[in-house]
């Protein structure tokens, strides 16, 4: 059964220059206990898709089309009478059944509030428990995520922790209410390589211990290979390919997916390896392409790619791609 179903989601932002079409007709599903990786360059729409889901869009952003069904309930903004009613509902589930691990703990954590205050806040907001009980749970969460001496450190401030330990606090806050869905938005971006590996090991072990479903937003295909069951490749505000991790890594279909893979070094390859960066820049979403969003950077682009958005081609029940190269209707 799908825990999350996003259908034809579009999100825009009003700016002085015009409307930015940040998310365009995105459809995704997530099963209970599954880990889905969303991969793409900066500005591809990964984070804004998740902010649309969680009701965390900036004031100039709005969902213009589509539906979002979470845990059997339609939580699309249009399903509510007004924004006030929608925001009130989202506050009830955000931090409770649906949580987010943000990429920059220094920004997310309040530097003038003790860790205890920030750890027990979701528990006090969403659970009918006393402050003493909430503190006990907070201490156990700190132990669970590998923070030493929790009885001492719970009384400290975030700035007294290292970057890796601050990220562990973020993870503990996300886990506080045993959420059904955890969204991890580039959770290792601000960390050095050694600490990145430790945090990923932690997320992997917590995944095995809980029933939570996870959406991992990243540009790092190594993270995807390690943690994810399925992968969605995003470019120019659109999902261009989805598949299992094996299908994406061993049988990629979209030229953008192939381009991403060609940028990754293979540590098992003894020969000198030449990496091939993708030429060009992502499309301007103030004026997105009429056809395929990747057309201006694609070495295999055809005339139809410029004028018509590719239809979805299905290679298996789990593997779909939007590319004219693989479509039976394409005029070569």
Map each language-model feature to its residues:
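Charged, flexible cofactor/metal-binding loops and thiol motifs
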Residues: 244-332
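Conserved ABC transporter NBD signature motif
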Residues: 63-77
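Conserved ABC ATPase "signature" region
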Residues: 73-74, 132-152, 261-262
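ABC ATPase NBD coupling module
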Residues: 75-99, 125, 247-252, 283-289
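A short, flexible loop at the N-terminus of ABC-type nucleotide-binding domains that lies
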Residues: 3, 12-25, 56-62, 78-90, ...
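P-loop NTP-binding/switch modules centered on Walker-like glycine-rich loops
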Residues: 55, 183-187, 191, 195-273
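A short, proline-enriched helix->beta-strand linker immediately N-terminal to the Walker B motif
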Residues: 176-180
